[in-house]
Amino acid sequence: MTDELIHVHDQFYIVSTSARLDDRTRVLKHGDTFAVFDRSGDIEAPGPPELGIYHQDTRFLSRLMLRLANKRPLLLSSTVKEDNALLTVDLTNLDVPHNDEVVVPRGTLHIFRSKLLWDAACYDRLRVHNYGRANVDLLFEIEFDADFVDLFEVRGVTRAKRGRRFPIELNDGVLEFGYEGLDRQVRRTSIRLDPLPVGLFDNRIHYRLELPPGGYATYQFAIQCELDESRSRSTIVRPVLIYEDVAGVAAAALRAVTSAEPEIFTANEQFNDWINRSIADLHMMRTETEYGPYPYAGVPWFSTVFGRDGIISALECLWFDSNIARGVLSYLAATQAEKENAEQDAQPGKILHERRGGEMAHLGEVPFGRYYGSVDATPLFVMLAGAYHERTGDDQFIESIWPNIERALLWIDKFGDLDGDGFAEYSRRSPRGLVNQGWKDSQDAIFYEDGELAEPPIALSEVQGYVYAAKCAAATLAPTLGKKNFGDQLADEAEQLRRQFEEKFWCDRLGVYGLALDGRKNLCRVRTSNAGHCLFTGIASEERAGRIASALTEEPFFSGWGVRTVAAGEARYNPMSYHNGSIWPHDNALIAAGCARYGFKREAANILAGLFESSLFFDLHRLPELFCGFPRRPGESPTLYPVACSPQTWASCAVFPLLQACLGLAIRDHHHEVVFRSPYLPQFLPEVQINRLRVGRGSVDLTLTRHETDVAVDVVRRKGEVNVLVLK
């Protein structure tokens, strides 16, 4: 058979018949560990550069390949189960020749492979079944390697020097790889093998596969990621290879989480698939920290704490699971900056942007060990605190983080407003930090109408909305803590900001708020999705909200799949760019929530429809971090963005605010109320059922049914004190 790879002049070429042409990947994650495999469950080079098993921003396994008789098995099927806990793969053999004769025909052997991740270990089980009528005697080989490169190296950052690798060893059925980094930390990959191999050749283990007709054999290995700064090699804890026990523990942990959540069903099975995958992605990205659950941002590039991403994800799913918001607030309060540090872009009261734990971060080769370079995370933190309190009525928790809220508000006024003009701005202080520090943080994301890049300090339109909403939220919280005068002051400041924002940011020619003010207070007259966030936060005027909502949900903003980050026709518009014309699901979700806030339910439903219909084309019904903003073409799918994270938590969580926006759903814990304000359901959603929706100590089961001119809300079951209000 022709080799899949051709090597010419130090370049690899893939033949047109190779399975390598399919670059779709499979992702597993648990805690601080994640894995990216090809669809066969392997880690192969050359292949997508992100393939590997990673722990705390380091790749602990860079190669994992199965071979039968020196050939890769043929892929039959591959999927990640609906709950994201298990990757299953079906493989078979290719023809095995011997002396010009095929001794094992293609399709004789079935390999069922299942993989799961738990507690910094990957468990891999292979069951090989002989469906032939003759004995099989083959060489079965598994190749491993561990390069221990930092995640930033995988992303393309080069290093002048690296640490040292240890020799590969096989002891008592455990294959060991080791590396001592320049940070003096020893990182090890220990692979426990069952059964014991017949031999080790370089980094390849060999088995003799001998099966009678109808016979089968099982092979298991556990790949453990270990960080070891002080222990000797003899004291390292080996992974316990009991696959069924690990699977049982993982299933029990998932049941504990899901039992506390609502159930959502609709009359549209495809919509249910999208919801179920989104919920599973939220479960997978939810990571237990010492401060509670935190949704890591995305796999593979952002599987860590991000302030902005965590807050927005928590806001998106707040009605569904308020525990995540509490965990996010706790974590960010504990890591709030206490002093100025230019290298970290930190000032007192500022909320964390990003935290990293790899070798390069430890050494300061990248500034992201603990980095504060975002202008919006701090007001978003206060916004989330207010929203969490409204959802839960958790006075005690809000009181515990009130000092952090006060410090965040002080940062907004003292450090966030760089020139005293009343607007929050950014201008990086770290020479290695982010140039742009809003959610659109690409270097070319903030520009004038002629395409020239804007000069800092930059005051983003949506950030003023976040500050407005933060002060409104704190103004509501303050009286509950006996600080009514402070609350009144904050309310006055919010109203003053709203009037000033209207005067400086509105552009009548564009029909939306401008993108930003530059350092000389010139307006960047560019049509961007940022204006939709001004609807979301409520800073937009009632008189202009309708014009904005209409503009965002029509061309040149709306592609048919969603709202573009930059309208078609603008100077830097490019539907294939990261921030200048692509479509981001979380961005669309906040825009839809903003449209609904001002009563524009049909516009919100149009956004919901576009993203739902796009989900039908994406692998596993999973919305990626972003996709390209090309116009929708009949009979064609959305165009993928090649390096988008998938899953990305705030993209996966987009379904929650989209559905909430259409339903007009609000939960007011202090009043024991579930409120539906002018509920609206699009034609493809004739019925929505929500069970176990918790309000305080009570819960309620609800069914919403679409009629020609109305939506009926029926209470199916009520437990405890829960009032359901429908406002039309």
Residue locations for each model-derived region?
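Aromatic-rich carbohydrate-recognition surfaces in CAZymes
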Residues: 303-435, 461-464, 468, 491, ...
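Generic structural signal for well-ordered, non-membrane alpha-helices
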Residues: 219-220, 280, 379, 383, ...
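Extended, well-ordered alpha-helical scaffold segments
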Residues: 234-249, 273-277, 321-335, 395-413, ...
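Terminal accessory carbohydrate-recognition/targeting modules of carbohydrate-active enzymes
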Residues: 1-279, 283-284, 288-293, 298-304, ...
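A generic structural motif
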Residues: 129-134, 459, 474, 481, ...
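The core hydrophobic/aromatic register in alpha-helical repeat solenoids, strongest
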Residues: 166, 177, 385, 467, ...
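Extended glycan-interaction surfaces of carbohydrate-active proteins
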Residues: 88-94, 103, 260-305, 330-372, ...
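Structural motif corresponding to the C-terminal cap of alpha-helices
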Residues: 282, 286-290, 314, 336, ...
